[in-house]
Amino acid sequence: LLPNVIHVSARCVASHALNIFGDHSDVYACRQTGYAMLAETNPQEVMDLGAVAHLSTIEGRVPFINFFDGFRTSHEIQKIEAWDYEDLREMVNMDAVNAFRARALNPEHPVLRGSAENGDIFFQHREACNRYYDALPEIVEKYMGKVNEKLGTNYDLFNYYGAPDADRVLIAMGSICDVAEEVIDYMNASGEKVGLIKVRLYRPFVAKKLVEAIPASVKKIAVLDRTKEPGALGEPLYLDVVTALASCGVSGIKVIGGRYGLGSKDTPPSSVFAAFENLAADEPKDHFTLGIVDDVTGLSLPEKDCPDTAPAGTIACKFWGLGGDGT
């Protein structure tokens, strides 16, 4: 229970080959560590929710991994509204800060840490941390509320975007959410009813809050994971969503899963269109892949040329560069 925040630009963990680029496999590998996990979509959210991570860890006494997509978000050059330290100061729980400082190692009030325990008491002590994790989501919500009040944002543990009466919904976290929003705007303007749930607080995963974010009209959900776990029944976020719905007694919603963006593979609007088109089928393909052509196991979804979903007046430029040439 040592408050700290590790800011992570999430990257690929080497498997059959080294890859230094972006996906979520390194973050998913940390699930058992007990770190809380907060996810962001773009540089502005990194600024805003990074503050939430620091404020929450001080009060909640649970360490945080605050993560965002490697390269796609971490290297994006973007204009943002930067925070001033005075903005943070007025939100900090100084009583919690002073209590944290008082727990520092000090010969005047020695404590025992890093002990070894046998089977007679280890299990009991391992469970003793439960109350801190149970209390943490409410603390995160509180500081998200403070940020919302200051900035006029609407950050929540799970944010829904799209038609209020959507019948098909994607669940994802990271930079794909901005792409999905453009596609959703286009599809809904064309008479479709689709939406997206953006996962903010990935750990602790609050099942009740996820269910509350899902419109009552939803019939099908596709969960998009940016990793691959060979041999598993599904990737981590997919399994979390399925478990959350089951634990809350939700039935009547078909849930499928898919993989995308491994090793910084691009996920353009055409991939998001393909995911929604797959959901519209009577029997959607499960455990699918996006953005590649899988001619070995046939798991990839076919992608078509898609309309331009960028806002009107957008000017697009492409720069070519390699390594350290300054591009």
Write out the residue ranges for each language-model feature.
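Conformationally flexible catalytic loops at phosphate/diphosphate-handling active centers
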Residues: F64-N159
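Conserved phosphate/anionic-ligand binding catalytic regions in large, soluble enzymes, centered on
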Residues: A316-T327
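Glycine-/acidic-rich phosphate or pyrophosphate-binding loops and their flanking alpha/beta elements
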Residues: G145-R168, E181, L301-A316
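Peripheral docking tails and interdomain loops at the edges
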Residues: K220-A310
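Short acidic, glycine/serine/threonine-rich loops at helix termini
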Residues: S15-F21, D48-A51, H75-A82, E86, ...
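Conserved thiamine diphosphate
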Residues: L18-G70, M94, T243-G263
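Redox- and metal-dependent alpha/beta enzyme cores, enriched for Fe-S-associated oxidoreductases
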Residues: P164-E192, F205-E212
